[in-house]
């Protein structure tokens, strides 16, 4: 773990818990390292003219995987516009773009040691849930309301 963090100079493990927290200097945030200062001109293909066809099997698969009801025209239109947007950004050239781990790469961020400070509060945490089953939260599946 330490070897991984040593490559990322912006991560530093706090060795003392009583160190005074340093505030970020927002004046230094005006020149991020990897974010370009000027927009990059790029030609995007016009995908709005082509009509996107989605067959019934694909819609049923998406409904099952995402637990979202796509029966309404509004939901189907949102899905189609999302596909058109994905088509546009798929053509962006990212060959020489280095990965951006955080926008604060020039700031050293303090990390605390990975130690349990409080624990054994399962009952207290589960009291926050409306519905539980044994020791688990029960959440509604997607946009379908949970019946009480």
From Swiss-Prot:
Reactions that this protein is recorded to catalyse: L-glutamyl-tRNA(Gln) + L-glutamine + ATP + H2O = L-glutaminyl-tRNA(Gln) + L-glutamate + ADP + phosphate + H(+)
Q: What class of enzyme is it?
A: ligase
Question: Any miscellaneous information on file?
Answer: This protein may be expected to contain an N-terminal transit peptide but none has been predicted.
Q: How does it assemble?
A: Subunit of the heterotrimeric GatCAB amidotransferase (AdT) complex, composed of A, B and C subunits.
Which BP terms from GO are recorded?
A: glutaminyl-tRNAGln biosynthesis via transamidation; mitochondrial translation; regulation of translational fidelity
Quote the Pfam families the UniProt record gives: GatC (PF02686)
Question: What EC number(s) is this enzyme filed under?
Answer: 6.3.5.-
Which key words are in the record?
A: ATP-binding, Ligase, Mitochondrion, Nucleotide-binding, Protein biosynthesis
**Full protein name:** Glutamyl-tRNA(Gln) amidotransferase subunit C, mitochondrial
* Family under the similarity heading: Belongs to the GatC family.
Molecular functions (GO terms):
ATP binding; glutaminyl-tRNA synthase (glutamine-hydrolyzing) activity
- Keyword Mitochondrion assigned to the entry: answer is yes
Domain of life (superkingdom): Eukaryota
Localization:
Mitochondrion
Described by its record, this protein's role is as follows:
Allows the formation of correctly charged Gln-tRNA(Gln) through the transamidation of misacylated Glu-tRNA(Gln) in the mitochondria. The reaction takes place in the presence of glutamine and ATP through an activated gamma-phospho-Glu-tRNA(Gln).
A GO term from the CC aspect: glutamyl-tRNA(Gln) amidotransferase complex
